[in-house]
Curated annotation (Swiss-Prot):
Gene that this sequence comes from: ABCG9
Stated role: Together with ABCG31, involved in pollen coat deposition of steryl glycosides required for pollen fitness. Together with ABCG11 and ABCG14, required for vascular development by regulating lipid/sterol homeostasis.
Protein's name in the database: ABC transporter G family member 9
UniProt-annotated binding residues for ATP: 84-91
GO biological process: cotyledon vascular tissue pattern formation; glycoside transport; pollen wall assembly; stem vascular tissue pattern formation
Keywords from the named record: ATP-binding, Cell membrane, Glycoprotein, Membrane, Nucleotide-binding, Transmembrane, Transmembrane helix, Transport
One Gene Ontology term of the molecular function aspect: ATP binding
Subunit details: Homodimer. Forms heterodimers with ABCG11.
Lyase recorded as keyword: no
Compartments in which it is found: Cell membrane
Length: 638
């Protein structure tokens, strides 16, 4: 799929609007609002904890400086490539320049300006940021991915059909037409190739015709031909008056000379900033030349940044210190003068731009539009997972097995009946818990990416996710109960069946809410699974079936247990306290259900309290999940 040439000249005609602003959209047209990016004396420090001992005692906090006084400028039409060994601070600098340093992640000092102004929400929403790991939904096709992004990111000055046409135009110009109906795919799901995935990620960002474009190692893991195509796209975008900043790991010679400016980093220190074509001459002037004439410049520069030179007698640390000193002596003053001397009077927004910053307001689209698009996207993404054959088979097998094991159980076998009720509450405690506990950890990267770009509010995302999961949460337990209830011969009164069904559905929603809350709080699948298992098992043990006489000092657990309230309501939905059942050795006696040993301690009072408790849990768990999600995508600026 990745062998087609990238089309550079295809334009998709789009109907003109009433104000005669046509949209023959091309991703390579001039940027609407050129931006000059400056950064001065950037220092970024983080605190790292060093735990000692088996239980992490004697924690020592170490402050590490990631970026050490970086200064530079990138003008419209230029590509700045940041080169350096792993751990040199490239991604940290890119994240800082893109305004995506998360709160609590570290301390950033210095000054970053965009046309001599600090980063605003409006500028941030017209800035593209492509992460190294392509955060894409695996079950969506290429077309669906770009169309949904267009519907969310383009402002309401575009009509819906215009947004769709713009998405398709981007797809055409990036050479993605041949795979437009192919799903993105993932680790265990075959989809588009690596190069096509990267172009889709770039396409998502250039839909808004950004003036600033940040990319984190866009050629990582790609073959040389595909990498050439990606950088060619960046080169064309820059020639349209955009400011492009990218980290690069080890580019080929062809790619190296396509970058206008180069920033070489060594352990967070700048050792070169200037024209990429002048880098080799500069290092030769300070006494560092390659041993062979024909060498990939990036290979030589990475050796330099690692402290590996032609002089084997010079230790790496001494060489790195010398390079930093040479930079401060020979280059720093000229870089500072360039930053100070640049004015941005020419960088005024075009009044005719429909993607100008003032068209966005606080958000590009309304709350309701965001909710509808996110709901539709979520349903399409999960259309194969929600009712997968494995899940449906699991539910039907368990329901029929329960129906057979408890086949037409009469009230004379009261112990068996309440055992079935407890099993129902137990099974439908764990099933929705583990369905929902992975929700937010799996979508963290996507949520981080989209929230950081100001694509939508958190509330429509959260509600669309909750509403979108309702079909799976409600239909499967309904099917389960319809089969099990009547096969097991529980109370044949239709009203009792619907009460039992209502209790079960609320129970499922509460258990699912607990899963959402744990996943959002922990944001780690393994840890959340372990924690969820412990909590739910505790709830079930305190539910009143296994242990009927709980010690006073620990009896409070049942009042926070989902299982306790559900089990009680299921019993209330089947029996009354004065209902009679056969008892005694030969079953000739008649006893009240309320006096049965397995039910007596549960009681038939406080049914309303139990219902209100479950309702409160249903709300509280989701509120906790929402609050926990507010930290995702939250940055220090913008």
């Amino acid at each position: 799929m990745d062998n087609q040439e990238v089309s550079m000249d295809v334009e998709t005609p789009i109907a003109k609007t009433n104000d005669d602003r046509s949209l023959p959209f091309s991703i390579f047209k001039k940027a609407n609002n050129p931006v000059t990016l400056k950064f001065e004396n950037l220092v970024y420090t983080v605190k790292l904890k060093d735990s000692q001992g088996c239980f992490g005692k004697n924690d020592k906090t170490e402050e590490r400086t990631i970026l050490k006084g970086l200064t530079g400028i990138v003008k419209p039409g230029e590509i700045l490539a940041m080169l350096g060994p792993s751990g040199s601070g490239k991604t940290s600098l890119l994240t800082a320049l893109g305004g995506r340093v998360g709160e609590g992640k570290g301390k950033l000092t210095g000054n970053i300006s965009y046309n001599n102004k600090p980063l605003s929400k409006a500028v941030k929403r017209t800035t593209g940021f492509v992460t190294q790991d392509d955060a894409l939904y695996p079950n969506l096709t290429v077309t669906e991915t770009l169309v949904f992004t267009a519907l969310l990111r383009l402002p309401n000055s575009f009509k819906k059909q215009e947004k769709i046409k713009q998405a398709k135009a981007v797809m055409t110009e990036l050479g993605l037409d041949r795979c437009k109906d192919t799903i993105i795919g993932g680790p265990f799901l075959r989809g588009v190739s690596g190069g096509e995935r990267k172009r889709v990620s770039i396409g998502q960002e250039i839909l808004i015709n950004p003036s600033l474009l940040f990319l984190d190692e866009p050629t990582s893991g790609l073959d040389s031909t595909t990498a050439q195509r990606i950088v060619s796209i960046l080169w064309e975008l820059a020639r349209g008056g955009r400011t492009v900043v990218t980290t690069i790991h080890q580019p080929s010679s062809r790619l190296f000379y396509m970058f206008d400016k180069l920033l070489l980093l060594s352990e967070g220190n700048p050792v070169y900033f200037g024209l990429g074509s002048n880098a080799m001459d500069y290092f030769a002037s300070v006494g560092y030349s390659p041993l062979v004439e024909r060498i990939n410049p990036s290979d030589f520069l990475l050796d330099i940044a690692n402290g590996v030179g032609s002089d084997e007698s010079q230790r790496p640390e001494a060489m790195k210190a010398a390079l930093v000193a040479f930079y401060k002596t020979n280059l720093l003053d000229s870089v500072i003068n360039e930053v100070k001397g640049q004015d941005d009077l020419c960088n005024k927004p075009r009044e005719s731009s429909r993607v100008a910053t003032n068209t966005y307001g606080d958000w590009p689209t309304t709350w309701w539009q965001q909710f509808c698009v996110l709901l539709k996207r979520g349903l399409k993404q999960r259309r194969h997972d929600s009712f997968s054959g494995m899940k449906v088979a699991q539910i039907f097998i368990v329901s029929f097995l329960c129906g057979l094991l408890w086949w037409q159980t009469k009230i004379s076998r009261l112990q068996d009946q309440i055992g079935l009720l407890f099993f129902i509450s137990s099974f439908w405690a764990f099933f929705p818990l583990f369905q929902q506990i992975f929700t937010f950890p799996q979508e963290r990267a996507m949520l981080q990416k989209e929230r950081s770009s100001g694509m939508y509010r958190l509330s429509p995302y959260f509600l669309s996710r909750v509403v979108g999961d309702l079909p799976m949460e409600l239909i499967l337990p309904t099917c389960f109960l319809v089969i099990t209830y009547w096969m097991a011969g529980l109370n044949h009164n239709l009203a009792n069946f619907f009460v039992t069904l209502l209790v079960l559905l609320v129970h499922v929603l509460v258990s699912g809410g607990l899963g959402l809350a744990l996943g959002a709080l922990v944001m780690d699948q393994k840890s959340a699974t372990t924690l969820g298992s412990v909590i739910m098992l505790t709830f079930l043990l305190a539910g009143g079936y296994y242990v009927q006489h709980v010690p006073v000092f620990i009896s409070w657990i049942k009042y926070v247990s989902i299982g306790y309230y559900t089990y009680k309501l299921l019993i209330l939905g089947q029996y009354t306290a004065n209902e009679l059942y056969p008892c005694g050795d030969n079953g000739k006696l008649r006893c009240h259900v309320g006096d049965f040993e397995g039910i007596k301690h549960i009681g038939f009072n406080s049914g309303l309290v139990s219902a209100l408790a479950l309702t409160a849990m249903l709300v509280v768990y989701r509120v906790i999940a929402y609050i926990a999600l507010t930290r995702i995508g939250k940055t220090k600026s913008g």
